[in-house]
């Protein structure tokens, strides 16, 4: 059984359709320039107009309105800076905190040299890199979660 069916050009009905410009070689208007120059920009501008219209008609409030006369108890950075903030907060010396943050990329640059004898790309066959990645991910999550707690509960995450 064939997957493709070839047209029977000896069929008079098919030959009549092909003579009129109908059939497998006629699909309507060409994509260039009609669709690409006229229809697509209209769709894109319509989408942008819809998004802007929804943003103007129903603006989403982000958090509570700012009160310039009330200072918050603790000012926190954006969520993606929580681990860095926690390192600076828990280390007693600020220079030590900056040195620890500079040591992280330097340590990551050493991993390929430590594991240079292993040429595999599969992470399960590269135990040193996988171990560093897993420990680094867990420590980063732990530091990020601890940044939202008060300083006395930040290292234990309020569990102990």
From Swiss-Prot:
GO function terms (MF aspect): electron transporter, transferring electrons within cytochrome b6/f complex of photosystem II activity; electron transporter, transferring electrons within the cyclic electron transport pathway of photosynthesis activity; oxidoreductase activity
Q: Where in the cell is it found?
A: Cellular thylakoid membrane
Alphabetical list of PROSITE patterns matching this protein: CYTB_CTER (PS51003)
Identify its membrane topology class.
Multi-pass membrane protein
For this protein, the record's CDD domains field holds:
cytochrome_b_C
Q: Where are the transmembrane segments?
A: 36-56, 95-115, 131-151
Q: Check the record and name the SUPFAM superfamilies matching this protein.
A: a domain/subunit of cytochrome bc1 complex (Ubiquinol-cytochrome c reductase)
Can you name a GO cellular component term? plasma membrane-derived thylakoid membrane
Pfam families xref list = Cytochrom_B_C
* InterPro entries, alphabetized: Cyt_b/b6_C, Cyt_b/b6_C_sf, Cyt_b6/f_cplx_suIV, Cytochrome_b_C_euk/bac
Q: What's the subunit arrangement here?
A: The 4 large subunits of the cytochrome b6-f complex are cytochrome b6, subunit IV (17 kDa polypeptide, PetD), cytochrome f and the Rieske protein, while the 4 small subunits are PetG, PetL, PetM and PetN. The complex functions as a dimer.
Q: Which NCBIfam families match?
A: cytb6_f_IV
Record family assignment: Belongs to the cytochrome b family. PetD subfamily.
Q: What does this protein do?
A: Component of the cytochrome b6-f complex, which mediates electron transfer between photosystem II (PSII) and photosystem I (PSI), cyclic electron flow around PSI, and state transitions.
Recorded protein name is Cytochrome b6-f complex subunit 4
Organism of origin: Gloeothece citriformis (strain PCC 7424) (Cyanothece sp. (strain PCC 7424))
